[in-house]
Amino acid sequence: MVDDSNYLTPHETALAVVATAMKKARLQLDTLLINSILGGVLFSSGSFLLVAVYSEDPDIVARNPGIVNLITGVNFAMGLFYVVMMGADLFNSNILFFSVGVLRKAVTIYDLMISWVVSWLGNIAGSLFVSYLFGHLSGISSQKLWIIGSRQIIEQKVSYSFVQTFLKGIACNFFVCLAIYLQLMAKPIHVKFILMSFPIIDFIGIGFTHVVGDMSASFIAMLNGANVSVGKYIWKLLIPASLGNIVGGLFFSAVVPFYLHLVVVERDRKRLSLPEYEARDEQPELNMDSRVVRIQKNECDDDATETGEDLENLTEKGFASIYNTNHDNSSYFTGRSLNSLRSIPSSVITSDNVTMESDLGEPVQFIPKSNSTTRSPHLGLPHNLPHNHSIKSINRHRINKRHSLRSPPGVFPVRGMGEPLEREKTIEDATYDPKENELFLRRAETHNSAYVKNKKKEDDNLLRLVKTEEDREQKEYEKNGGYNILENKPGTRLEKIITHLAENVSSREVTPPILPRTTQDTFPHNAPASSPAYTDDAHSLRKANSTTLGGLFRAVSKEFHSSKDAESPDDLLKKMAAVGINRNARITANNVAGIVNLNKEDLDSTTRRQKITEPKNFYNRHTSPQL
């Protein structure tokens, strides 16, 4: 199956799911919304046919409902086929793509949230648009039989409990994801339709619940006056079916593509040292599912030349025009005329290792007019290119120039482009270890001179340098003019918004009050360098307090105290004596603090009448004059 270009192996199909998820993650919101509305419009064709079959021949429904279920299964398969071929977005299929993508770490949870929410809302909008405009207003769904049939359909669906609808939704999307997965394995269009038809017929015939498939039928019935309110439809059908489809899609995605076809296969290949392949996406364009193929590593460079096969069909005249365009023939060829050049057999010209030598005469010597490197308008090659290049080597020269452009970050490795970045290599092959990359090891030794000497920290350094190398490659790609997909996709914007909101909420939290620092805390006599006043925590605390309104008010107002007219030192001494402070204590207070530092509010307190006794053999040594 590997050699057949029309089919893919399960491992290649699982990688195609990952590549498609990365492709859908870079869709802008307007494109994603339009794709989702289109998906609802296209898939509603199955719902319209469901109502038509059940309404216009009620006798068959009553006598042989199995035939009706088989027919409606084919109808929904047609709707899914339209969605896949047009590259539209369906909520149920996006569950498959982004679940595997998140498990593979190819996309983020923010990409998943945007895709699921927008596609879900877009499918609702598209289904409602078709049901109202082309169903109700056109009068098609207002026919008597359609009114009766549509009412019966939705009233039967909402008759189940929440849990019953939830369980039916789980089984339904398991089959839908299986249908999407099977069609990825085939390239012919008719085979795609056949493969996706079987699972769709299964879940329709059994009676499972598809949230998008039931939308148009439910809207038609409610517009026809069914005994179902909008709230009842949302609670009994829309919500349980959506949740069930999510669970069923997650289960299929985690078990089949991710675990069985990616983890198990790659783990076994590494254990047995099986031949290694490079996986490349040959359909990287938007609005279409990816197609991942495997090629051997030594074939990656030669693969780029396949796109230049049209150049190999050039005639000898076209080949000769490379050398004589806008110039005189005699200026380029000596010893041989241009006719002798044209007489060289084509088999000789198209050989890989051929030179312009033959048995017809002396070798042709190329003599350029000047050292100009003006490019030929035909092939874009310099005129001073040596003549011994064959057409195939010229093709390789041009294609390899394009091939040297690395596969962009955030995109699954593209066939025909250069080597992907480190992050994309790990997405392509989970067993790839950047630490084993020879080029990476050389750069690691350059960045860290102690890398080889300190074996104990070797692994930690490598893990750190892996991220450094990935960032370096991405910056180098952007510097060369590459488009940064990772910074411009909607999921990244959503992540930045949520992070910004979280930071604002955390910054609004009130800082718990702390006691003022003492002189000993600020300037410890035994270790001044370890003072908390000079630590980062103290600096950040002072900065935080200074940026708040309360902190600014405290900083400005702490130097001011309410007071009346200035008092003389005699008045202060009298108040000190009135509260019981003796003369020697008053003198000591004057020597230690000074009169200007006395606070009269402390002296006014009548509760502080504690008598200060005079220390013995201490104040006799003071010679300060009495006040």
Curated annotation (Swiss-Prot):
Keywords: Membrane, Phosphoprotein, Transmembrane, Transmembrane helix, Transport. The keyword Repeat does not apply. Residues 605-614 have a biased composition (Basic and acidic residues). The keyword Transmembrane applies. Residues 517-533 have a biased composition (Polar residues). The modification Phosphoserine is found at S546. It comes from the Eukaryota. Its main location: membrane. GO terms for biological process: chloride transport; nitrite transport; regulation of chloride transport. Residues 512-537, 605-627 are annotated as: Disordered. The modification Phosphothreonine is found at T305, T588. It comes from Saccharomyces cerevisiae (strain ATCC 204508 / S288c). GO terms for molecular function: high-affinity secondary active nitrite transmembrane transporter activity; molecular sensor activity. This is Uncharacterized transporter YHL008C.
